[in-house]
């Protein structure tokens, strides 16, 4: 009539303290989320960085800009956003991508990663292929 009682149930304490999972993201405001989505859609290659391409304000942003330049990214297909100008943007992009650091690179609306990932992809040739597939490189002159 009564089923067997699991020994695990007997050994388990009646009260278990559960810690809620901690997430990097809080609820983004609708306006911030829409602004980030709009920025990501503004060009095939989008970089959220500290400073500007002409005047990067951190070594990682500078290294990422230099790598994109070495890869031959077409300036007409590139957009950069200075997160130092807007605290909501700075925190929002981290939450949006669930990536804790800046710079953050997007190609064709897909999050690629930060400086370390971009550098690794450049070394393996993956970045060149990704940018070529996105048609984001300066076209080669026909001779």
UniProtKB/Swiss-Prot annotation:
Looking up Gene3D superfamilies in the UniProt record yields:
Glutaredoxin
> Which InterPro entries does the record cross-reference, listed alphabetically?
Glutaredoxin, GRX_PICOT-like, Monothiol_GRX-rel, Thioredoxin-like_sf
Localization (cell): Mitochondrion matrix
Q: Which residues form the Glutaredoxin domain?
A: 33-138
Q: Pfam families from the entry? A: Glutaredoxin
Q: Which domain of life is it from?
A: Eukaryota
> Can you name one GO molecular function term for this protein?
2 iron, 2 sulfur cluster binding
* Amino acids binding glutathione: 50, 90-94, 102, 115-116
| List of residues binding [2Fe-2S] cluster | 58
Q: Where along the chain is the transit peptide annotated? A: 1-28
Task: List UniProt keywords, sorted A-Z.
Answer: 2Fe-2S, Iron, Iron-sulfur, Metal-binding, Mitochondrion, Redox-active center, Transit peptide
Q: Which SUPFAM superfamilies match?
A: Thioredoxin-like
Question: Where mainly located?
Answer: mitochondrion
Annotated Gene Ontology cellular component terms: mitochondrial matrix
Q: What does this protein do?
A: Monothiol glutaredoxin involved in mitochondrial iron-sulfur (Fe/S) cluster transfer. Receives iron-sulfur clusters from scaffold protein ISU1 and mediates their transfer to apoproteins, to the 4Fe/FS cluster biosynthesis machinery, or export from mitochondrion.
In terms of PANTHER family, this protein maps to: GLUTAREDOXIN FAMILY MEMBER, GLUTAREDOXIN-RELATED PROTEIN 5, MITOCHONDRIAL
How it assembles, according to the record, is: Homodimer.
| Similarity comment: family membership | Belongs to the glutaredoxin family. Monothiol subfamily.
What protein name applies here? Monothiol glutaredoxin-5, mitochondrial
List the source organism. Lachancea kluyveri
């Amino acid at each position: 009539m009564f089923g067997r009682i699991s020994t695990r149930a007997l050994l388990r304490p009646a009260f278990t303290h559960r810690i809620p999972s901690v997430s990097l993201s809080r609820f983004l405001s609708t306006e911030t989320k829409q602004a980030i989505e709009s920025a990501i859609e503004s060009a095939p290659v989008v970089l959220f960085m500290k400073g500007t391409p002409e005047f990067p304000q951190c070594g990682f942003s500078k290294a990422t800009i230099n790598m994109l330049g070495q890869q031959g990214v077409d300036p007409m297909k590139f957009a950069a956003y200075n997160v130092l100008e807007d605290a909501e943007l700075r925190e929002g992009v981290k939450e949006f991508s669930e990536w804790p650091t800046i710079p953050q690179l997007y190609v064709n609306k897909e999050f690629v990663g930060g400086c370390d990932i971009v550098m690794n992809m450049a070394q393996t040739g993956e970045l060149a292929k990704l940018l070529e597939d996105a048609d984001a490189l300066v076209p080669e002159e026909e001779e």
